């Protein structure tokens, strides 16, 4: 059953979603990017039209985004609509933000739950992969130990194909995190182009990596994600042809000891 606060917010947004009431709506956390927020009654997501469509947004993903942008008013609204307080806590930068969102007593998300997202949930849809991407790349509270676990899981997945490994290595050397590269890789592998477009928007410099992975799988749809010159695309095509030509038939050992060694910095 919806809480009294949720019912009040719904009534306010339905009665006062007019231009002259934007100050009230902003104060109540019902406006984002100059648009009024509605809770979809069909999919339980969030939208700007009060109508269900494929533009409805996942509440947890939206919550992560607004906390990163420091909009605690909207964050409170999303929490009242059922967004995950556990994930909200991972994105709070200090105790003041936790207190403002009443998250002091919320349990931390266990490491294995985040790892489970990395290894399974991203296959569901674009939004699930974006949640994984936000958790690993934009959360301030993911522990160093968890990042190492994630690093090990990623490396154990990719090292059996040295062509893929070499492509990762080129961009890892440019100071992109392994988890960022891996999320881009998954978006292309599972053809989650909406997620890919949003991730590349956050890290524009990673676009050539997306092209290289796309060409590795003969997927030229990736080039439509963002505009590039013909020369940029041709350069990526030639580079991946060279990488596949040199490494294409080489495979690594897959035992645990070798995977762990490969995950250390001297192999990257």
Curated annotation (Swiss-Prot):
Assigned keywords, A-Z: Early protein, Host membrane, Membrane, Transmembrane, Transmembrane helix
GO cellular component: host cell membrane; membrane
Cytoplasmic side: 1-175
Residues passing through the membrane, by range: 176-193
Disulfide bridge positions per record: none
Induction line: Expressed in the early phase of the viral replicative cycle.
Side of membrane Extracellular, spans: 194-268
Main location: host cell
Compartmental location: Host membrane
Protein name: Protein MGF 300-1L
Biological source species: African swine fever virus (isolate Pig/Kenya/KEN-50/1950)
